[in-house]
UniProtKB/Swiss-Prot annotation:
UniProt keywords, alphabetically: Cell outer membrane, Membrane, Signal, Transmembrane, Transmembrane beta strand
Organism phylogeny: Bacteria, Pseudomonadati, Pseudomonadota, Gammaproteobacteria, Enterobacterales
Species for this entry: Escherichia coli (strain K12)
Protein name per Swiss-Prot or TrEMBL: Putative uncharacterized outer membrane protein YejO
Subcellular location per the Swiss-Prot or TrEMBL entry: Cell outer membrane
Annotated Pfam families: AIDA (PF16168), Autotransporter (PF03797), Pertactin (PF03212)
Membrane-topology annotation of the record: Peripheral membrane protein
Entry superkingdom: Bacteria
Main location: membrane
Domain Autotransporter: 595-863
Signal sequence segment: 1-29
Gene3D superfamilies in the record: 2.160.20.20, Autotransporter beta-domain (2.40.128.130)
A GO CC term assigned to this protein in UniProt: cell outer membrane
Length: 863
């Protein structure tokens, strides 16, 4: 071997090793020297440099084979790796199942079969069969004797050539008129491309032809999956576009023509006539050109910067007026004009220019007028705009509709405000508006408003000369800042219309009203369409008031607070009930140890309680509480008395259903201590102190069904003292008693998601109770004891000033003061000398609170 060859070999090997080391965790290189032959090598995550001959090689993913100068590979199977054929190298009878075969300049690939993968040619490819995958011929590369079967693709780029191509049915060719030369046969006969002229091309199944400026294409067939793209200045005649084929062209093409369902279409001298587009085909109408009687169907597109007349947009096709997107660049034109368009389940976007007389129909029909573009006049609608049969009409910002007669029939017009930082409202003017079972929706631009404060909200004023028919208007208000959407009819208004207003939690000043509708006359009737004819605005509900002077205003109804207000009151009123339910477990424990001798005990009690509550402030809810209390206590005996001292820890969860919709939750964590003293004559005194941590969550419902969410934490503390006398007569005992209970929460401020502000003051219990308990003790033969018992009590609640402030509308008082009765029954049982249990149930009613049940079940272990 010559020294120069050795140096070249070393340099090549080192280059490959360095490159692969950078991109592969494991890269092993082997060399087949000049004159050497190897057979059956499998390459996986390694590299082979071939200067000699490599037969029957398999290249799997991660493997590479480099056929160097005068190197040869025979019968190589490529399954995902790379084969590089360098200058004067050759690959014979290769099969590509996946991966790449790259033929560099001066290299050759002969008798190659592509099942999948890519054969990329900068040199030469001879006798290639493409069953799948792609053969790409780059500039100065060439392919001779190519058979393209169904699913295969031959791509010839500018400056490349392909001779003797056999394009079988379903085979695809992708190329340009700037290819050096391409010729062969297809199922329609012979085809060729040379010197910028393409003849008899068949485009299908992913094939395409790009006709460049000043180039020509004659008698092109665009079948399903094919694409013919005609650049500005290109000429195409005899186009036969089949179903599923695509044709993309602009009116700046010198000429495009061919047959269609109307006979013949043409684009010539800047005028398109009778052009039918479907299956993703596209037409661009350039400035100072025009399109006449164009039909867009089946996802076709049309972009017009010029003038079009009689265009039909249907079957999910898309039309753009005053805007085009080409080669990554967007162009606008205020000179664009569209006249007499019909949209039938298609979409038209108006970016700039003027649209004169348009009809939109069908559930998928959309006419959307975009907000004014920078440095361009607002888009204009002129003449009749008829929207019907479930179609949608949308306008963004201050577009020019002052000369439009809008007719809405069973359809929706969405007016979208242009959000700005200058707080300029959107003003929209019409010539006339007619409605029939239609909706007009005024709304914000659907973008994140994090940088726009509530005071900068952009409202809409819709002004029309006349209004007739029937339908609904959906408006936004900001009563607190005296702003809203408005409808202004300068002339006559006739018909029946409903106004829908969005609920909000923020309150205006007391007595404020806000005018939403004004007319110049006529017998039109406007009513509030919200559920119940009311809208939630802060603390109180509002109604739509006919002022008697052809104007209608939102006015406050102080007789009824909003559901959000009741939600705030409900949560405040529920917390004392949580404290009380947890307290009952400790009272049961203290009652069960009267006259019982033990040293130390651990106990637990599970509770389930239901409370139905109404307050004078208007709150109303149903509370279901479940919880568990754990305790430990010890008994200390003296000469004539005994004492008990203990600690408790508990948790409870309350599900609260609000009477006017929505729900809340309270998770309570409690810690406390208790003590009792009992004299041998039966006199006793019990005491409990307890603190709570409340985690409160609100999922309220406004009148319109929207959610008002909020959460906050609060704390509570309370004490209970009970004194009585226990008489024992044989197995019977009677225990009359008096008790006093006090409880308070700390004040908390929070805000709901609808903007309502709540300032909850101290919520308190101050209660006196008088009652009597009766029990009977039974000893069973198996050693078990039973003690059924009954208790009845009368409670008097004195706390009548539990105040809650909502927004700035004064304070509401959750007053549950009054008299109530409580009736209880239970049973205690000892199973063993150290294990006992109890069950109880109670009913209470009075002072705005009904407790259908309060159940307890517990066990006690003494030791």
């Amino acid at each position: 071997m010559h020294q120069s060859g050795s140096v070249s070999l070393c340099r090549s090997a080192i280059s490959v090793l360095v490159a692969t080391a950078l991109y592969s965790p494991i890269a092993l290189a082997s060399t087949v020297e000049y004159g050497e032959t190897v057979d059956g090598v499998v390459l996986e995550k390694d590299i082979q440099l071939v200067y000699g001959t490599a037969n029957n090689t398999k290249i799997n993913p991660g493997g590479e084979q480099h056929i160097k100068e005068f190197g040869v590979s025979n019968n190589t199977e490529i399954n995902g790796g790379y084969q590089y054929i360098e200058m004067n190298g050759a690959a014979e009878y290769s099969v590509l199942n996946d991966g790449y075969q790259i033929v560099q300049m001066g290299g050759a690939a002969n008798q190659t079969t592509l099942n999948n993968g890519v054969l990329q040619v900068y040199g030469a490819a001879n006798d290639t069969t493409i069953k799948g995958g792609r053969l790409i011929v780059e500039k100065d590369g060439g392919a001779v004797f190519v058979a393209i079967e169904k699913g295969g693709l031959l791509e010839v780029k500018e400056g490349g050539f392909a001779f003797a191509v056999d394009q079988k049915a379903g085979g695809a060719i992708k190329t340009t008129t700037r290819a050096m030369e391409v010729f062969g046969t297809n199922r329609l006969g012979q085809f060729d491309i040379k010197n910028g002229i393409a003849n008899n091309m068949l485009l299908e199944n992913g094939g395409s032809l790009r006709v460049e400026e000043n180039d020509f294409a004659y008698n092109t067939t665009v079948d399903s999956g094919g694409l013919l793209e005609v650049m500005d200045g290109g000429t195409v005649t005899g186009v036969d576009k089949k179903a599923g084929g695509k044709l993309i062209v602009s009116t700046n093409a010198l000429e495009v023509s061919g047959p269609n369902s109307k006979g013949q279409f043409s684009i010539k001298d800047g005028v398109s006539k009778n052009y039918e587009l479907d299956d993703g085909s596209g037409l661009i109408v350039m400035e100072d050109t025009q399109a006449i009687d164009t039909i867009l169907d089946k996802h076709a597109t049309m972009q017009s910067l010029g003038k079009d007349t009689g265009t039909k947009v249907q079957a999910n096709a898309v039309y753009d007026l005053g805007r085009s997107y080409q080669n990554g660049s967007i162009t606008y034109s205020s000179k664009a004009i569209s006249e007499n368009m019909v949209i039938n389940n298609g979409r038209a976007n108006v970016w700039a220019g003027t649209m004169v007389n348009v009809s939109v129909r069908g559930n998928d029909g959309i006419l959307e007028v975009m907000k004014p573009q920078i440095n361009y006049a607002p888009a204009m609608l002129v003449g009749k705009v008829v929207v019907s049969e479930g179609a949608s009409f949308r306008t963004h910002g201050a577009v020019d509709t002052s000369k439009a007669d809008v007719s809405l029939e069973n359809s929706v017009w969405t007016i979208i405000a242009d959000i700005t930082t200058t707080n300029q409202n959107t003003l929209l003017n019409l010539a006339n508006l007619a409605m029939s079972d239609a909706n007009v929706i005024m709304m914000d631009e659907p973008v994140t408003r994090s940088s726009v404060t509530a005071s900068a909200e952009n409202f809409i004023t819709l002004t029309t000369n006349t209004l007739s028919g029937n339908g609904n208007f959906y408006m936004r208000t900001d009563m607190a800042n005296h702003q809203s959407d408005q409808l202004n009819v300068t002339g006559q208004a006739t018909g029946d219309f409903k106004i829908f207003v969005t609920d909000t939690g923020a309150s205006p000043a007391a007595g404020d009203s806000l005018t939403l509708v004004t007319t110049g006359g006529g017998d039109a009737a406007f009513t509030l369409g919200n559920a119940g004819g009311v809208v939630d605005i802060g603390t109180y509900e509002y109604t739509l008031l006919d002022n008697g002077n052809h104007s209608w205003s939102l006015a406050e109804n102080r007789a009824q607070i909003t559901p959000s207000t009741t939600d705030v009151l409900n949560m405040a009123a529920a917390q004392p009930l949580v404290f009380d339910a947890e307290l009952d477990t400790v009272r049961e424990r203290l009652g069960s140890v009267k006259g019982v001798s033990y040293d130390t005990a651990m106990w637990s009690s599970a509770i389930n309680t239901r409370n139905n509550v109404t307050t004078d402030a208007g709150a109303g809810f149903e509370q279901t509480l479940t919880g568990l209390t754990l305790g430990i206590d010890s008994r200390f005996s003296r000469e004539e008395s005994s004492t008990i001292r203990g600690l408790i820890f508990g948790y409870s969860h309350s599900d609260i259903g609000f009477d006017r919709g929505g729900k809340g939750n309270i998770d309570s964590y409690t810690l406390g201590a208790y003590a009792g003293w009992e004299h041998q004559n039966g006199a006793y005194v019990d005491g409990v102190v307890k603190v709570d941590r409340f985690a409160n969550t609100i999922h309220g419902k406004m009148s319109n069904g929207a959610t008002a969410f909020g959460d906050y934490n609060s704390n509570g503390a309370g004490a209970h003292v009970e004194s009585g006398f226990r008489w024992v007569d044989g197995l019977w005992s009677v225990r009359p008693y008096l008790a006093f209970t006090g409880f308070t929460t700390d004040g908390q401020d929070y805000t709901l998601s609808n903007g309502m502000r709540a300032d909850v003051g101290n919520t308190r219990i101050l209660r006196a109770e008088a009652g009597t308990a009766v029990s009977y003790h039974m000893d069973l033969q198996n050693g078990t004891t039973l003690e059924p018992w009954l208790k009845a009590a009368v409670r008097q609640e004195y706390a009548d000033s539990n105040q809650v402030k909502v927004n700035d509308d004064g304070k509401f008082n959750n007053d549950v003061a009054g008299t109530s009765g409580v009736y209880q029954a239970g049973i205690r049982s000892s199973f063993t000398p150290t294990l006992s249990g109890h069950l109880s149930v109670s009913y209470g009613n009075g002072a705005g609170v009904e407790s259908p049940w309060n159940t307890q079940a517990g066990v006690v272990w003494t030791f």
